[in-house]
Structures are given as C-alpha cells and as structure tokens.
C-alpha cells in the first residue's frame, strides 16, 4: 500500500497525463463542426478534472475538499460522456486510443468517487 502523499502525487500526475492525452487525441477527430464543438467541451471537462483535483489537494478544510472532489467527479463523468459521444458518432478512426481513454476515464471516476464517499464520512 502506498502512502497518502504518494497517492496524491500519483493522481495529480495521472489526471494531468489523462488531460494531455485527451487533448492530443482531439487532433485525430474528423474535421467537422460536430468534432469542433465536442473537442471544445471535452477539453474543458478533462482539464477541469485535473485542475480541480489539484485544487482539492490544496483544500484548507474537509468541507472545501469535499466541494472540490464533487466537481472532479462531475467533470470526469462529463469527460466520459463526451468520449462516448465520439464513439457513438464515429468521429475518429483511432478506436484503440478511444477505448484506452474510455477505460482511463472510468478508472478515474471510480477512484474519485471513492475519495468523495470517503471524505463525506
């Protein structure tokens, strides 16, 4: 089992890497109006996931942490939604990468949801 501080740093890096990976993935989308709108929303939600996790880690109270981690879960879920829309509308040929991003999104949601429920107690 890793120490709390190590876990926090690991998740900061993981959410940031996920944001970078999604941003780079957006370049592979078909060049059309739908992909422009979806990319914009996806980049906003994935970068917000990483940024709000960093903010949660600097929270000054349990209440502030809970508030920020709720935003993280919400934004991570929105990220998954936009990735699913890309999949359903076939806006990319990069299906292996899309599948990997969907799996990572789900893992991040599960981890952050657990942190949220643990901090509520």
Task: Annotate each PLM feature.
Residues 1-52, 59-121:
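Short, C-terminally biased terminal segments at protein or domain edges
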């Amino acid at each position: 089992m890793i120490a709390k501080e190590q876990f926090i740093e690991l998740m900061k890096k993981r959410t940031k890497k996920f944001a970078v990976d999604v941003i780079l993935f957006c370049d592979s989308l078909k060049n059309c109006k739908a992909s422009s709108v979806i990319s914009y929303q996806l980049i906003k939600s994935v970068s917000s996931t990483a940024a709000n996790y960093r903010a949660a880690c600097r929270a000054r109270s349990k209440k502030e942490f809970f508030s920020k981690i709720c935003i993280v879960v919400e934004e991570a879920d929105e990220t998954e939604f936009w990735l699913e829309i890309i999949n359903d509308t076939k806006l990319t040929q990069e299906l292996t990468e899309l599948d990997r991003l969907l799996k990572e999104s789900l893992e991040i949601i599960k981890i952050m949801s657990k942190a949220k429920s643990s901090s509520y107690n």
